[in-house]
Amino acid sequence: MAFVNTLLRTIRCSAVHTLVQEGRSLSLLKASHQLTQSRKIMLSNHVRKEEAKSEPNETLDLEEWKSILKSDIGNAEMVKTETQEDSSLNEMQELVEMWRLAGRAVPQSITTEQLQVLMELPTKTARKKYLKYLSVREVMKTNRKEKKKELKESKSKIESLDQLETKEDTPEKKNTFLLHVWDKSIDTMQRWKCVQAMKFGQPLVFDMVYEKNMSRYELENTVCQLMESEGWNRRSTDPFHIYFCSLQPYSMYHKELVKRYIGAWDNVFVTATDKSHVEMFPKEQLVYLTADSPNELKHFDHTKIYIIGSLVDRCQQTGLSLANAKRLNLATARLPLDRYLKWDVGAKNLTLDQMIRILLCLKDTGDWKKALSFVPNRKHDGFAEPAASKKRNIKNDGGMEYAASTKRNLQKNSKMYKFGASKSFIKPERTDDTSIRSTRKRWWEEEN
């Protein structure tokens, strides 16, 4: 076998040299090279085991090939967009530094999120105003920190002086059978209630589909109200099982919640899901609470699942939540503010923490007056009597007044038609006036 291979090699080399000397074409050389390279000499009748195994025909999966190409293109586009964003952020950072050197109102430190907001602003004046707002907020924050430090120092000084004065007069500590309740034990009790509510409690849904209808400032305000709502629910005696429905991962809502909770977002006893409330619960049990609804909520139903729209609309987008509920064919209701309150000024939209406090009070007591006491006093002029009780009072009082007035009229008529009954209705008999006239003095008569 080795001998044959060496022989072929020598023949090929000699043929190449002769062709080169005679000036043959390169195509012939290439063809001869391919032919000699692909030749296989079998000196035995037996076939090798490796070649005997028939290899399966490998078919090319076009879908997989397309997906790989698309993923490569998508990754390239993502890299391009990331580089573009980084370059634009660097440009905005340089612009802020230039304005700071020029002596304009610019914050000393600015985050990437604030730079992104600055990039989204369309005009130069809007960017100037936003930077001025950030600088003012930074100054206020530093002033607050300094005041807190001063208060702490003054408190520590006062406490040290008090300790020195009262060190001699301190009485001996007495034993007591009452145990001290620590803040940690209260916190664990509240968390245990939330765990029980997640298993057995009534659900309460916060609809998180209004991210596109709000500005960044309104979204931050909404997240603050959601955190307050979760706190009030945790501290209540019978908490709700709170659902954050349609909360997309890595959305502005999600990022702001993770940022505000400072690492404690995973430990909050709230069910956060990207599914809609229609997918989570049956439609028959859902009631969407909105101020634009024509239906009034007369009593709290413990079998229903109430939905609150997570929306802070400074520009008063009326009918947004009602349109969303109608699109999904859901029942709607509004709080009976006109029936129980003398509404004075302002819209009837309440904040999220006020809504959950009203619902918690209704769930515990069922008293509308207690529940609506959480409505701000600046919006109404006190409580009014319910319409049903007013009608009842009008019926009762009106009937009594009507009976009294008819009795009075009958007495008057009887006196009028009774002969000699009253001097006011029947004229008295005429008497002789001569004696009276004689006693009167005349103006022309002289006095004796």
From Swiss-Prot:
The identity of this protein, by name, is tRNA methyltransferase 10 homolog C
Function field: Mitochondrial tRNA N(1)-methyltransferase involved in mitochondrial tRNA maturation. Component of mitochondrial ribonuclease P, which cleaves tRNA molecules in their 5'-ends. Together with hsd17b10/mrpp2, forms a subcomplex of the mitochondrial ribonuclease P, named MRPP1-MRPP2 subcomplex, which displays functions that are independent of the ribonuclease P activity. The MRPP1-MRPP2 subcomplex catalyzes the formation of N(1)-methylguanine and N(1)-methyladenine at position 9 (m1G9 and m1A9, respectively) in tRNAs; trmt10c/mrpp1 acting as the catalytic N(1)-methyltransferase subunit.
Respond yes or no to whether keyword Metal-binding is given for this record. no
How is the quaternary structure described? Component of mitochondrial ribonuclease P. Interacts with HSD17B10/MRPP2.
In short, the EC number is 2.1.1.-, 2.1.1.218, 2.1.1.221
GO BP terms: namely: methylation; mitochondrial tRNA 5'-end processing; mitochondrial tRNA processing; mRNA processing
Native species = Xenopus tropicalis
Starting at the broadest rank, the lineage of the source organism is: Eukaryota, Metazoa, Chordata, Craniata, Vertebrata
Alphabetical list of Pfam families matching this protein: tRNA_m1G_MT
